[in-house]
Structures are given as structure tokens and as C-alpha cells.
């Protein structure tokens, strides 16, 4: 499968980001970019064009490290949006391909996406290599995030199957969704980040190894209990019902709902809840889950308990999917797509679900016979997990290979 360029060859015109971007979520005030060590990066002047442009920047120079000049040739635009532009580039010194996300930077504020990406290091989260600032002839300041390049998105992989009237093989559904939940388990527990925009377009896939990675942390935030957040977040088809109800004190379980929608979409070949607007989105959800009870509405947003909704019975999950659907897939979807946020399983519990048991088999391989991408090299996400859950997550053959020496051992 080849990579397809998205969007026009030139960057869209960008308006400066207002301080309230991504919400009643306040951005941190930054008095001076140049004096902020955490944000320090070279500022390159006159960086208007994208495709064909060569960008040189300096990295290193901290803690006695030698300074090093790196040059990138911008090759093609791979994504555009209100945030800015993402382009593929090649490092002229090493030949390595990278993705560079270029966003307009308000000089008064820190960039939250950069701050969060610096915290993260996981096989199922796209990695930040370094960053630099650039200016244009109009004296606009841009932040450039240099990330590993992953050629495909889950959206395009699924489209590859649906355009030829095929279903994605169930093995790949398992492999991709397991890695999505593993990435979510990491960001939810280690840095404590909620992604807030999980969807197939924000899930990268390497077509050779089938490794899957979360990307685009432009909407992400560390959620603090008792602190209000904006509810108008997350792309519509994947938006949790509490967000549609206008909740502002939600939890990272909104990502679990979104991931449940992605799972259902891979199984069905199309979105499960294709609402045309927020109200229609809720109607689509009610058509499957039925009318929420007063208690479920209270769990989503206490201010809505007096609203009257048409009484619709839940559609049985086994009728939502085709007859030959594995019962474990249906069971997992039903545990993820619950009205009450606290009743949705956690990302780590989802990883341990029997739907993924095939991936834990000693002889599990890709259909072409190649080894699976890394699935069991867990990091801090296992801290606080019960021994029973860890035993279900890490297969016995993996424990034997490591002589039980993984960081969070499950006990005897």
C-alpha cells in the first residue's frame, strides 16, 4: 500500500491561535521563548515555503553536548488542518524520513502539545525527535515538531479494504486495536494525559511491521480532578456522550469511548455512530444503546437529568454486527461503549480482554510469517495493576524468556 499525499501542496493561511485554543483549558503564559530552557530551539528566518524547501537547524549544545547542524528537505504535505500543516521531510545528513508538524505559535504562550510530547516515550505513541522555531517574512513565529515518520494512517488502511468491498481481516483488527489500547494505557497512567481526539486519522500504521501509534496531541491535556475542561472536543463520530451532554469534568474514559468507536468501525467497515451534528450524533448512539436511564444521564452530566428523551430500546449488540462476528469482539465493544464513564473498562483492562488472546499465543506471527510488532514490553502503565491483571497481560512464554525480569512482576 502506498502513502497518499493529503491536502494542497502549499500550507493553508493560518490565523494566530487564540489563548483559549483547546478549551476553557487555559494555556500557560510564556513571557519569553528565548529565555525558556524547556522550549529553547533554533529560530530560522524566512521559512515561508514548504515543499522543496531546505531547513537547517542546530540541535544539542546543552549539558556539554556538542552542537550539531541538521538539514531537512521538505518533500510533500501529508496533512493539513486548522492547527497548521504536517509535511514529510528527509534529513540530508542521514537520509532518514521524518514528519514535521508546523503550527503557528503565539509568542505569549507555551505550546501544550510540545510539553506533553516531551513527557512521552512508548512504542505505541509517535515519538518527538526535537523541535525548532521558524519565522516568515510576515514575522509570524512557527513551532516545528520533528517526529518519526510513519507512512500510513488507520483511516487509509481501512479505506483500502472498504474501497474493494472487503472487510479488514479480524487478525489485523485485533493487532491494531490492542496497540491503540496499549498506547492509551500508557498515556493515561504514566504522564496522565487524555488524548481527546482518538480517531482512525490520528492512528499511524507502519504497513511493513503493522506497528500502530497514537499521534496528534494537539487536543491532548492532563486532566485534573475538579478542574473544568471544554466539552467541544473530539471529532464528532468518536465523541463520548458526556461531551455531547456538555460535561466539563470528564475523565480519560472519553478516549475509551473513542477507541470503542474505532474498534466498531474496523469491524463494520464504516462508522458506528455517523451523526451529522451533535443532536444527530446522540440520536445515532441512542439507536444502538437505547435511551439512557436517569442515572446514566446523571453520570454524564447532572444538569440534564430533567430532560425528557424519547424512550427507545437498546439494539442487541449481536445484531449491530454481522452474524459471523467473534463473540469476544462484540463483548469488548459492549464494555467500551457504555453511557456511564465509570463503567467503561480501562485501557489496560481492554488489553487483557479475551478478544486479544490470539496475539498472546506463543507462535503468533503476522499472516506473512514475520514476527509481530512489540506487544508486551510494558512500561509504567503496569504500575498499580493487580497481579491477576498482569498475569493476563504478559503471556507465560514471554515471562519465561525474560526470566520473570519485567519491571512490574506479578508475584508467584
Curated annotation (Swiss-Prot):
One of its GO terms (biological process) is brassinosteroid mediated signaling pathway. ATP binds at residues 78-86, 101. Pfam families: Pkinase. The modification Phosphotyrosine is found at residue 232. The modification Phosphoserine is found at residues 26, 127, 219, 252, 342. Its EC number is 2.7.11.1. InterPro entries: GSK-3, Kinase-like_dom_sf, Prot_kinase_dom, Protein_kinase_ATP_BS, Ser/Thr_kinase_AS, STKc_GSK3. It is an enzyme of class 2 (transferase). The active site is at residue 197. PROSITE patterns: PROTEIN_KINASE_ATP, PROTEIN_KINASE_DOM, PROTEIN_KINASE_ST. Residues 72-356 form the Protein kinase domain. Residues 1-19 have a biased composition (Pro residues). Residues 1-33 are annotated as: Disordered. Keywords: ATP-binding, Kinase, Nucleotide-binding, Phosphoprotein, Serine/threonine-protein kinase, Transferase. One of its GO terms (molecular function) is ATP binding. Autophosphorylated mainly on threonine and serine residues. The modification Phosphothreonine is found at residues 136-137, 293, 346. Binds to KIB1. Interacts with beet curly top virus AL4/C4 and tomato golden mosaic virus AL4/AC4. May mediate extracellular signals to regulate transcription in differentiating cells. This is Shaggy-related protein kinase zeta. The lineage of its organism: Eukaryota, Viridiplantae, Streptophyta, Embryophyta, Tracheophyta.
